Protein backbone atom coordinates (compact mmCIF):
# COMPACT_ATOMS: atom_id res chain seq x y z
CA UNK A 1 0.00 0.00 0.00
CA UNK A 2 1.06 3.56 -0.61
CA UNK A 3 0.94 6.20 2.12
CA UNK A 4 -2.49 7.46 0.99
CA UNK A 5 -4.20 4.05 1.01
CA UNK A 6 -5.65 1.86 3.76
CA UNK A 7 -7.73 -1.27 4.27
CA UNK A 8 -10.53 -1.34 6.82
CA UNK A 9 -12.42 -4.39 8.08
CA UNK A 10 -15.90 -3.10 8.96
CA UNK A 11 -17.54 -6.45 9.74
CA UNK A 12 -17.78 -5.53 13.41
CA UNK A 13 -17.44 -1.77 13.51
CA UNK A 14 -17.58 0.35 16.65
CA UNK A 15 -20.07 2.76 15.07
CA UNK A 16 -22.65 -0.02 14.82
CA UNK A 17 -23.32 0.85 11.17
CA UNK A 18 -24.90 -2.05 9.29
CA UNK A 19 -23.97 -1.01 5.74
CA UNK A 20 -20.40 -1.05 4.42
CA UNK A 21 -21.44 1.36 1.67
CA UNK A 22 -22.79 3.77 4.28
CA UNK A 23 -19.46 3.59 6.10
CA UNK A 24 -17.60 4.30 2.84
CA UNK A 25 -19.64 7.45 2.25
CA UNK A 26 -19.14 8.52 5.87
CA UNK A 27 -15.35 8.13 5.51
CA UNK A 28 -15.37 10.20 2.31
CA UNK A 29 -17.35 12.95 4.03
CA UNK A 30 -15.07 12.93 7.06
CA UNK A 31 -11.87 13.07 4.97
CA UNK A 32 -13.20 15.94 2.86
CA UNK A 33 -14.36 17.95 5.88
CA UNK A 34 -11.09 17.48 7.78
CA UNK A 35 -8.44 17.81 5.06
CA UNK A 36 -10.34 19.06 2.00
CA UNK A 37 -9.41 16.05 -0.16
CA UNK A 38 -11.59 13.64 -2.12
CA UNK A 39 -11.03 9.88 -2.07
CA UNK A 40 -12.39 6.88 -3.90
CA UNK A 41 -13.46 3.79 -1.95
CA UNK A 42 -13.78 0.14 -2.92
CA UNK A 43 -16.17 -2.04 -0.94
CA UNK A 44 -16.07 -5.83 -1.21
CA UNK A 45 -15.78 -9.11 0.65
CA UNK A 46 -11.98 -9.47 0.44
CA UNK A 47 -8.89 -7.25 0.24
CA UNK A 48 -8.09 -7.93 -3.41
CA UNK A 49 -11.53 -6.95 -4.68
CA UNK A 50 -11.75 -3.91 -2.41
CA UNK A 51 -8.38 -2.74 -3.76
CA UNK A 52 -9.48 -3.28 -7.38
CA UNK A 53 -12.80 -1.52 -6.79
CA UNK A 54 -11.10 1.51 -5.24
CA UNK A 55 -9.52 2.32 -8.59
CA UNK A 56 -12.88 2.81 -10.27
CA UNK A 57 -14.97 6.00 -10.25
CA UNK A 58 -12.10 8.24 -9.18
CA UNK A 59 -11.68 10.75 -7.69
CA UNK A 60 -14.62 10.49 -5.31
CA UNK A 61 -16.73 7.45 -6.13
CA UNK A 62 -17.72 4.37 -4.17
CA UNK A 63 -17.59 1.05 -6.04
CA UNK A 64 -19.21 -2.03 -4.52
CA UNK A 65 -18.31 -5.56 -5.63
CA UNK A 66 -20.71 -8.23 -4.33
CA UNK A 67 -20.25 -12.02 -4.50
CA UNK A 68 -22.87 -12.02 -7.26
CA UNK A 69 -21.05 -9.64 -9.61
CA UNK A 70 -17.44 -10.40 -8.60
CA UNK A 71 -16.53 -12.82 -11.39
CA UNK A 72 -17.98 -10.58 -14.08
CA UNK A 73 -16.03 -7.63 -12.66
CA UNK A 74 -12.75 -9.56 -12.37
CA UNK A 75 -12.85 -10.81 -15.95
CA UNK A 76 -12.66 -7.22 -17.26
CA UNK A 77 -9.58 -6.28 -15.21
CA UNK A 78 -6.38 -5.78 -17.29
CA UNK A 79 -3.75 -8.28 -16.19
CA UNK A 80 -1.29 -5.53 -15.18
CA UNK A 81 -3.84 -4.29 -12.62
CA UNK A 82 -4.00 -7.59 -10.73
CA UNK A 83 -2.53 -7.27 -7.25
CA UNK A 84 1.10 -8.44 -7.15
CA UNK A 85 1.65 -8.20 -10.92
CA UNK A 86 4.60 -5.92 -11.68
CA UNK A 87 5.95 -4.78 -15.04
CA UNK A 88 8.07 -7.90 -15.64
CA UNK A 89 5.27 -10.30 -14.66
CA UNK A 90 2.76 -8.37 -16.76
CA UNK A 91 4.96 -8.68 -19.87
CA UNK A 92 5.41 -12.40 -19.25
CA UNK A 93 1.65 -12.90 -18.84
CA UNK A 94 0.89 -10.89 -21.98
CA UNK A 95 3.40 -12.92 -24.02
CA UNK A 96 1.47 -16.00 -22.90
CA UNK A 97 -1.72 -14.43 -24.29
CA UNK A 98 -3.14 -13.42 -20.90
CA UNK A 99 -4.33 -9.83 -21.24
CA UNK A 100 -7.32 -9.73 -18.86
CA UNK A 101 -9.04 -11.74 -16.16
CA UNK A 102 -11.10 -13.32 -18.95
CA UNK A 103 -7.93 -14.90 -20.38
CA UNK A 104 -6.69 -15.93 -16.94
CA UNK A 105 -9.83 -17.67 -15.72
CA UNK A 106 -9.68 -20.92 -17.80
CA UNK A 107 -6.16 -21.82 -16.65
CA UNK A 108 -5.69 -24.34 -13.85
CA UNK A 109 -3.76 -23.64 -10.67
CA UNK A 110 -1.10 -26.12 -11.77
CA UNK A 111 -0.66 -24.46 -15.18
CA UNK A 112 -0.32 -21.04 -13.65
CA UNK A 113 2.18 -22.21 -11.04
CA UNK A 114 4.27 -23.99 -13.67
CA UNK A 115 4.39 -20.92 -15.93
CA UNK A 116 4.56 -18.12 -13.38
CA UNK A 117 5.91 -19.63 -10.16
CA UNK A 118 4.59 -18.36 -6.81
CA UNK A 119 2.47 -15.73 -8.57
CA UNK A 120 0.41 -18.45 -10.26
CA UNK A 121 -1.62 -19.72 -7.25
CA UNK A 122 -2.30 -16.13 -6.14
CA UNK A 123 -3.69 -15.24 -9.58
CA UNK A 124 -5.75 -18.43 -9.61
CA UNK A 125 -7.48 -17.36 -6.39
CA UNK A 126 -7.81 -13.70 -7.36
CA UNK A 127 -9.51 -14.35 -10.69
CA UNK A 128 -12.10 -16.46 -8.84
CA UNK A 129 -12.70 -13.84 -6.19
CA UNK A 130 -11.17 -16.14 -3.58
CA UNK A 131 -8.12 -14.17 -2.47
CA UNK A 132 -7.14 -15.34 1.02
CA UNK A 133 -5.04 -12.32 2.03
CA UNK A 134 -5.64 -11.52 5.68
CA UNK A 135 -6.00 -8.01 7.03
CA UNK A 136 -3.04 -7.02 9.20
CA UNK A 137 -4.49 -5.11 12.12
CA UNK A 138 -1.20 -3.78 13.45
CA UNK A 139 1.73 -3.02 11.19
CA UNK A 140 4.74 -0.90 12.01
CA UNK A 141 5.26 1.99 9.62
CA UNK A 142 8.42 1.80 7.52
CA UNK A 143 8.29 5.43 6.41
CA UNK A 144 6.28 8.63 6.69
CA UNK A 145 6.18 11.21 3.94
CA UNK A 146 4.45 14.23 2.51
CA UNK A 147 4.67 15.94 -0.88
CA UNK A 148 3.15 18.80 -2.82
CA UNK A 149 2.43 19.25 -6.53
CA UNK A 150 2.84 22.94 -7.26
CA UNK A 151 0.15 24.98 -8.99
CA UNK A 152 2.91 26.53 -11.10
CA UNK A 153 6.42 25.15 -11.76
CA UNK A 154 9.08 27.23 -10.02
CA UNK A 155 12.82 27.71 -9.59
CA UNK A 156 12.31 30.00 -6.58
CA UNK A 157 14.45 28.60 -3.75
CA UNK A 158 12.49 30.57 -1.17
CA UNK A 159 9.18 28.99 -2.16
CA UNK A 160 10.64 25.48 -2.32
CA UNK A 161 12.53 25.66 0.98
CA UNK A 162 9.39 27.14 2.52
CA UNK A 163 7.59 23.92 1.64
CA UNK A 164 10.43 21.91 3.18
CA UNK A 165 10.06 23.85 6.43
CA UNK A 166 6.31 23.11 6.44
CA UNK A 167 6.95 19.43 5.68
CA UNK A 168 9.50 19.15 8.50
CA UNK A 169 7.02 20.63 10.97
CA UNK A 170 4.29 18.27 9.75
CA UNK A 171 6.61 15.25 10.00
CA UNK A 172 7.68 16.23 13.53
CA UNK A 173 4.01 16.20 14.52
CA UNK A 174 3.47 12.77 12.97
CA UNK A 175 6.53 11.35 14.72
CA UNK A 176 5.61 12.70 18.14
CA UNK A 177 2.00 11.59 17.78
CA UNK A 178 3.21 8.02 17.19
CA UNK A 179 6.16 8.18 19.63
CA UNK A 180 8.63 7.61 16.79
CA UNK A 181 12.03 8.88 15.73
CA UNK A 182 13.80 8.50 12.38
CA UNK A 183 17.32 8.12 11.02
CA UNK A 184 16.83 8.63 7.27
CA UNK A 185 15.56 11.72 5.46
CA UNK A 186 14.75 11.57 1.73
CA UNK A 187 14.09 14.54 -0.54
CA UNK A 188 12.09 14.09 -3.73
CA UNK A 189 12.01 16.57 -6.61
CA UNK A 190 10.16 16.32 -9.92
CA UNK A 191 10.91 18.83 -12.66
CA UNK A 192 8.72 20.32 -15.38
CA UNK A 193 9.66 17.47 -17.74
CA UNK A 194 8.50 14.90 -15.16
CA UNK A 195 12.01 13.72 -14.29
CA UNK A 196 11.93 12.50 -10.67
CA UNK A 197 15.04 12.74 -8.48
CA UNK A 198 15.51 11.48 -4.92
CA UNK A 199 18.39 11.68 -2.49
CA UNK A 200 18.70 10.39 1.08
CA UNK A 201 20.84 10.88 4.14
CA UNK A 202 20.97 8.33 6.97
CA UNK A 203 22.14 9.68 10.31
CA UNK A 204 23.97 7.81 13.05
CA UNK A 205 21.55 9.02 15.71
CA UNK A 206 17.75 9.08 15.72
CA UNK A 207 15.97 12.41 15.44
CA UNK A 208 12.39 13.68 15.67
CA UNK A 209 12.62 17.48 15.82
CA UNK A 210 11.46 19.84 13.08
CA UNK A 211 14.72 21.81 12.98
CA UNK A 212 16.80 18.63 12.61
CA UNK A 213 14.66 17.28 9.78
CA UNK A 214 14.60 20.65 8.04
CA UNK A 215 18.37 21.08 8.32
CA UNK A 216 18.98 17.76 6.57
CA UNK A 217 16.29 18.47 3.96
CA UNK A 218 17.91 21.83 3.23
CA UNK A 219 21.30 20.18 2.81
CA UNK A 220 19.82 17.70 0.33
CA UNK A 221 18.01 20.50 -1.50
CA UNK A 222 21.23 22.49 -1.95
CA UNK A 223 22.98 19.39 -3.31
CA UNK A 224 20.17 18.48 -5.73
CA UNK A 225 18.69 21.76 -6.90
CA UNK A 226 19.65 23.07 -10.31
CA UNK A 227 18.10 25.93 -12.24
CA UNK A 228 15.22 23.91 -13.65
CA UNK A 229 11.55 24.45 -12.86
CA UNK A 230 10.24 22.17 -10.10
CA UNK A 231 6.74 20.72 -10.38
CA UNK A 232 6.65 18.54 -7.23
CA UNK A 233 8.57 18.52 -3.96
CA UNK A 234 8.35 15.89 -1.23
CA UNK A 235 10.01 14.83 2.01
CA UNK A 236 10.04 11.32 3.51
CA UNK A 237 11.51 9.99 6.76
CA UNK A 238 12.33 6.33 7.34
CA UNK A 239 14.29 3.91 9.54
CA UNK A 240 11.65 4.57 12.18
CA UNK A 241 11.93 3.42 15.77
CA UNK A 242 9.70 3.74 18.81
CA UNK A 243 11.16 6.37 21.15
CA UNK A 244 10.24 4.34 24.25
CA UNK A 245 12.22 1.41 22.86
CA UNK A 246 15.16 3.70 22.13
CA UNK A 247 15.05 5.00 25.70
CA UNK A 248 15.08 1.47 27.09
CA UNK A 249 18.02 0.53 24.86
CA UNK A 250 19.99 3.58 25.99
CA UNK A 251 19.34 2.75 29.67
CA UNK A 252 21.17 -0.59 29.23
CA UNK A 253 24.52 1.12 28.73
Predicted segments with their positions:
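Nucleic-acid-contacting surfaces of polymerase cores and analogous helical-repeat interfaces
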Residues: 1-151
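Extracellular/lumenal ectodomain signal focusing on beta-strand-rich modules
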Residues: 5, 232-234
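Solvent-exposed residues in well-ordered beta-strands and their adjoining turns
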Residues: 9-13, 190, 238
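DNA-contacting surface of Y-family translesion DNA polymerases
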Residues: 81, 91-232, 239-253
Amino acid sequence: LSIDEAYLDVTDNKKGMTSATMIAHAIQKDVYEKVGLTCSVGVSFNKFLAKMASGYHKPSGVTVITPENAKEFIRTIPIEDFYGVGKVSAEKLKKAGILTGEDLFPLSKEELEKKFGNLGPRLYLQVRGESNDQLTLHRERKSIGTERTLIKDTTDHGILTGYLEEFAEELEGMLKKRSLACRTVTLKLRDSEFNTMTKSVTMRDYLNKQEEIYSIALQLFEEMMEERPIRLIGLTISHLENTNRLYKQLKLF
